[in-house]
Amino acid sequence: MTDRAMSYPRILADVGGTNVRFAMETAPMRIGEITAYKVAEHASLEAAMRLYMLTRSGAARPRHAAIGLANPVTGDQVKLTNHNWAFSVEAMRRALDLDTLVAINDFTSLALALPYLPDASLVQVRDGTAVATAPRALIGPGTGLGVSGLIPAPGGAVALAGEGGHIEIMPVTDDEWIAWRAAHDQFGRVSAERLLSGMGLSHIHAALSAEMGTPLEVPLAPAQVTDGAMRAGDPVCRRAFDAFCGMLGSVAADVALVLGARGGVYLGGGIVPRFVDALRASTFAERFVAKGRMGSFLADVPVYVITAEYPALPGLARALADRLEADARRAETSQS
């Protein structure tokens, strides 16, 4: 195992639909030099990473990097779902003169980060007692809807890589049905992400406005809907917000049931941390256990909101360390 193979610093990049956040890991889990760029302001991820490498203060050249992407990562070729960036992981590694470039789904990296998040960055919004040896579920509305889980396994926990945000969603209340039907008329199939995301919150509000006979020429931005619900006392914004929280409770419970997540459910993404108190006061917790015969299974499952500003970065560091250790073991085996 060479010094270069395990060297620091290492670049970490968390790529969302709106922003890309770069950081430098200078020692195990020592993460700093965090810089955020707007995705729309850069022609490619490679260009954004080059800019970050040019502007960082450290003298040592990074040899290894990990990127988390709000996108399925199933091979070398990557095309972002919510932006026009597309690239080959291997070609970008060579272009940036890196020894290692790991690409994983952003919610896979966030799941890997769960054991490293301090208690101060977690706000419990539903009572319960986590079972330390049980799976944990992760769901997060943002530009899209991320879903993952952390599953205990021999040798360390395994983070799931999937696209659970695109499962079907089942409305319950009248307002939810109004939003669902409007989405169905527009898109055909209605995934959970269509309603449980930033664009989903805007869509719910627009659908309710149209149902009331006051269609909008331009939908409100998600922040406008939440502001209208919590501060301005707008009744349509309030109904949209309530529908959003109720459906989030239902879908979070579905993910918990699939994974057997007695280790807790974690809410990430860029939306929910903005209204933690309002989520507590909503129907989220009620809908979380409204699962018929399985309500008793969910009754003691705690739910936490992740409030850390850059929560996925420790998970990227973990994924990169795991890859380097695996590569080193393979190299040692081939030489023996």
From Swiss-Prot:
SUPFAM superfamilies attached to this UniProt entry: Actin-like ATPase domain (SSF53067)
Reactions that this protein is recorded to catalyse: D-glucose + ATP = D-glucose 6-phosphate + ADP + H(+)
One GO molecular-function entry: ATP binding
Protein name (record): Glucokinase
NCBIfam families xrefs: glk, PRK00292.1-3
Keyword set includes Protease: no
Cellular component, GO annotation: cytosol
Organism: Cupriavidus metallidurans (strain ATCC 43123 / DSM 2839 / NBRC 102507 / CH34)
Localization terms from the record: Cytoplasm
A single BP term in Gene Ontology: glycolytic process
Keywords assigned by UniProt, alphabetized: ATP-binding, Cytoplasm, Glycolysis, Kinase, Nucleotide-binding, Plasmid, Transferase
Family: Belongs to the bacterial glucokinase family.
EC number(s) recorded for this UniProt protein: 2.7.1.2
